């Protein structure tokens, strides 16, 4: 847990240990407390990624509908195996054809050889010798074009555009893969997220002792900055920081309706095996 807190905050081991003790082992509370006290460097937004596998995308011929599926394996070696990759492509194609994103229902879909997705998964498990799981799927439909991008088989993004074309969509999807915005525009940030950010800002050291009107002015400025940082349209475009994503899309006569971003293993905590301890325990009988 100390290691994870260090990775997410960039702080030293002793500082992280102390923060975890004070937060009774609650890592999210520890990060909030460290930010409030002004200790923490910018906390990394991405959750810890532990599980292996791949993200695969399938798009219809008109490029107006796309499905993205995350399928997990136990090791990165298997995630690069041709049998695994072939299975991923078949699952995505079947999900697209049926317009399905429910994992249980995807398992019931028929493949071209007549077997179900679940039967094919079980056969793959027997052949490869690892646990293979279809974890989640996302689907987008666009009035204009769908933008799709998969980075290294591990990060997948779908963009639904109103107007525009696939090339613009791919550019925006690459940006989302790299920068990981929270929402399309600032007005979509959930109220609870906004309130939590306000609470953290109010508790920061430079707010202490200032008149209420000054605090509110500073709060407003910092909240506006936060909203721009997490909103896709307000972010500097990753391929040309001199323009924003919003300006890029507007210049093309398009709008971003929505996006989906999947990262392999996101939110799954992988068990860390201490092989030295295992050997020692085995030696002791």
Swiss-Prot record:
GO terms (molecular function) for this protein are:
translation elongation factor activity
GO cellular component terms, alphabetically, are: cytoplasm
Chief location bin: cytoplasm
Domain of life of the native organism: Bacteria
Positions of the UniProt region annotated as Involved in Mg(2+) ion dislocation from EF-Tu: 75-78
CDD domains referenced in this protein's UniProt entry, alphabetically: UBA_EF-Ts
HAMAP family per UniProt? EF_Ts (MF_00050)
Protein name, per record: Elongation factor Ts
The organism of origin for this protein: Alcanivorax borkumensis (strain ATCC 700651 / DSM 11573 / NCIMB 13689 / SK2)
């Amino acid at each position: 847990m100390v290691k994870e807190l260090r990775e997410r905050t960039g702080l030293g081991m002793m500082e992280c240990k102390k923060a975890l003790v004070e937060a009774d082992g609650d890592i999210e509370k520890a990060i909030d407390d460290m930010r409030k006290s002004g200790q923490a460097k910018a906390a990394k937004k991405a959750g810890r990624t532990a599980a292996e596998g791949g993200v695969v995308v399938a798009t219809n011929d008109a490029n107006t509908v796309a499905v993205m599926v995350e399928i997990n394996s136990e090791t990165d070696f298997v995630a690069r195996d041709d049998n695994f990759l072939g299975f991923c492509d078949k699952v995505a194609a079947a999900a697209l054809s049926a317009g399905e994103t429910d994992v249980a229902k995807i398992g019931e879909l028929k493949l071209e050889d007549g077997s179900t997705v679940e039967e094919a998964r079980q056969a793959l498990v027997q052949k490869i010798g690892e646990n293979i799981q279809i974890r989640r799927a996302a689907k987008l439909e666009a009035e204009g074009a769908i933008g799709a991008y998969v980075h290294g088989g591990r990060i997948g993004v779908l963009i639904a555009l109103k107007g525009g074309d696939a090339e613009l969509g791919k550019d925006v999807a690459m940006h989302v893969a790299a920068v990981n915005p929270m929402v399309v525009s600032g007005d979509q940030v959930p109220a609870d997220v906004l309130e939590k950010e306000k609470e953290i800002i109010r508790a920061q050291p430079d707010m202490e002792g200032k008149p209420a009107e000054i605090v509110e002015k500073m709060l407003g400025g910092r909240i506006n900055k936060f909203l721009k940082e997490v909103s896709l349209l307000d972010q500097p475009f990753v391929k040309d920081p001199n323009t924003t994503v919003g300006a890029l899309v507007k210049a093309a006569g398009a709008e971003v309706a929505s996006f989906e971003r999947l990262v392999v293993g996101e939110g799954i905590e992988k068990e860390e095996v201490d092989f030295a301890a295992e050997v020692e325990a085995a030696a002791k009988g």
